[in-house]
Amino acid sequence: MAGERERGGGHRGPREERDSEFVDKLVHINRVAKVVKGGKRFGFAALVVIGDQKGRVGFGHGKAREVPEAIRKATESAKRNLTRVPLREGRTLHHDIAGRHGAGRVYLRAAPAGTGIIAGGPMRAVFETLGIQDVVAKSIGSSNPYNMVRATFDALKHQDSPRSVAARRNLKVSTLQSRRVGGDAEVVAE
C-alpha cells in the first residue's frame, strides 16, 4: 500500500505518462521590459498551443522573468483552456468558417484528402496540435500571433458537426447529408 503511493498515486500512473497525450507548440516568445527607477527589468511572455491531435486544442499565455518559466506557465494555462472541435473523418473541417479577433481575420476551408496544411505561422501550430491534416487557411489584417491564434479559435468555436446541426433542426443526419449532395440519398448511403 505504501509502495503504491510512492510511485505516483495508485492507478493514475506517473505524471509524465498522463501529460504525454498532449503535443505542445511554442508559437511566440516576446521580450518585455518594465522601466523601474534603476533602469529596465526584462521579462518574457510566451504563447503556447497544446492539443491531443484528436480534436482537443487550447492556447495559453505565460509571463515570467525567465523563458522556461514563461513557457511552463503558458502550457499550464493552455491545459486549463482546452476545447473540443468536431473533425470530419478525423482529418479536416466539416465546413468553411471565418473568425476574427481585433483587426485579425482568418478564413478556414475544408480540403480534400492529401492537400495538407496550407496555413502560415500561428495557424499551422493550431492545426497540427488539433490533428487537422487537410485545410486551407488565409489570414487577413493583423499578423500579430496573439490575434491570429485567437481569431483561429473564434473560427473553430463556430465549427458544427452534421450531428449537431441535425439535432438543432430536428432532422436525421442522413436527411441532412442527402440534401447536401443534391437530393440523391442513395449516393450518401453507399
Curated annotation (Swiss-Prot):
GO term, biological process aspect, one: translation
Residue intervals of the S5 DRBM domain: 22-85
GO MF annotation list: rRNA binding; structural constituent of ribosome
Entry keyword set: Ribonucleoprotein, Ribosomal protein, RNA-binding, rRNA-binding
Family annotation (PROSITE patterns): RIBOSOMAL_S5 (PS00585), S5_DSRBD (PS50881)
Gene Ontology CC: small ribosomal subunit
UniProt remark on domains: The N-terminal domain interacts with the head of the 30S subunit; the C-terminal domain interacts with the body and contacts protein S4. The interaction surface between S4 and S5 is involved in control of translational fidelity.
Quaternary state and interactors: Part of the 30S ribosomal subunit. Contacts proteins S4 and S8.
Record NCBIfam families: rpsE_bact
Family classification: Belongs to the universal ribosomal protein uS5 family.
Known function: With S4 and S12 plays an important role in translational accuracy. Located at the back of the 30S subunit body where it stabilizes the conformation of the head with respect to the body.
Protein's UniProt name: Small ribosomal subunit protein uS5
Organism name: Rhodopseudomonas palustris (strain BisB18)
